[in-house]
C-alpha cells in the first residue's frame, strides 16, 4: 500500500517502536497530549517536544496539517504505523491519530535518541 500524501519520510520500524516507548514513558512519568486537536494546540503553543503521527489515518486531512505546522514551529515529528499503537501508548482503549510529548519524564534518554535519529532522517537538526 502506498504511503499517504502527508508522510514525508520513511521511518524504520525500530525507530517507530522507540517513539512509542518514549510516548508510553512520558504518559507514565511526564506529560502528553492525546489526539489531533490537543497535539495541534501543543504545537501552536510551542510546548511539544515530539509529535507522533499515525500513517493509517482516514481521511488524510485529519492530520495533514501537522507536518507543515511542526516544521514551521521547528518541532520534531515522527510517523508510526498505526493509530492503535499511539492509542495504546497513551493508555487509551481506542486509536489516536496523533499525540504530542510535552514532558518526557523518565523517557528523556529515549526521546533524545528518537529526536536525533529523526533529524538524521530528515536532514534537519
Swiss-Prot record:
Keywords of the record: Cytoplasm, Ribonucleoprotein, Ribosomal protein, RNA-binding, rRNA-binding, tRNA processing
GO CC, any one term: ribonucleoprotein complex
Molecular-function GO terms, alphabetical: ribonuclease P activity; rRNA binding; structural constituent of ribosome
Localization annotation: Cytoplasm
Database matches in InterPro entries: eL8/uL1-like, Ribosomal_eL30-like_sf, Ribosomal_eL8/eL30/eS12/Gad45, Ribosomal_eL8/Nhp2, Ribosomal_eL8_arc
GO biological process, one term: translation
PANTHER family: RIBOSOMAL PROTEIN L7AE FAMILY MEMBER
Family: Belongs to the eukaryotic ribosomal protein eL8 family.
Protein function: Multifunctional RNA-binding protein that recognizes the K-turn motif in ribosomal RNA, the RNA component of RNase P, box H/ACA, box C/D and box C'/D' sRNAs.
Subunit and partners: Part of the 50S ribosomal subunit. Probably part of the RNase P complex.
Protein name listed in UniProt: Large ribosomal subunit protein eL8
